[in-house]
Amino acid sequence: SRRQRQMCIRDRNAEFLVAVPTDITDVEKRAFFELFYKSKFRPKNVMLCEKPLADAVGLGIDVNQPTGVMVVDMGADTIEISVISLGGLVLSDLMHFGSNRLDESIISYIRREFNLVIGKKTAKALKEELGSGLPGRQETMTVVGLDVVSGLPVEREITAEVVYEAIKANLESICSSIKLILEKTPPELARDIIYAGIYITGGGSKIKDLDQLFTQITNIKVNTCENPEESAVRGLSKIATDSKYKRIPFSMKNTTLK
């Protein structure tokens, strides 16, 4: 998927740097390696980097420091909650759903509550325009869908409250995972996180008031960023060019090729 193929190329036919999810097996990592190593570009090597580290570097964080950092990466297909320190991962939880699941929840909810069938593009537009981490927003949006009973296209006004109710259960699952990771975090690193705040990134983090929701459930401030969907790519670029991050990428060349 797209989240697993974010990539920075130092030089054509030279070396690839690929961000991979943390919660995958060595077999899956080898599959990633071979996918790029045997591609038409024929690089001399493929270096892998755990995606939370790329995200953090892309956010401007020096991951080599002994301080603890929490990053919540809300991608299209997965959500990864990680605690980072000393250039590595201390804790990580990969949730096997992402912002695309929110679109599906909106489609299901509107069909169930209004007998209206909408498409994925409409659901995504509703999420982006009306989606919120907290209830109480007053915005509305007019959509066109198919009436389940008549089969004919109809217009209907959808409120922000409807969208909130549709995605509420998904948001609660994310909140539960964040709290679980915080409970497992060593006290010294937890202190750092309380001081610096939680960082959220990925395209799904652009949902309105999501930072306020996470602050409410953790009592910790939440940091957002511009163009959050590009943070991993920015991080890979820095890792590829800054020698202080040279220990972060790893290769499976010797363990894969016969």
What are these regions (language model features)?
Residues R3-M74, I84-I198, S205-V233, S237-K258:
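Nucleotide/phosphate-binding catalytic cleft detector across ATP-hydrolyzing
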Residues A76-T78:
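Short acidic, Gly/Ser-rich segments with clustered Asp/Glu that frequently serve as metal-coordination loops
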Residues E80-S82:
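A structural feature that tracks compact, well-ordered secondary-structure segments
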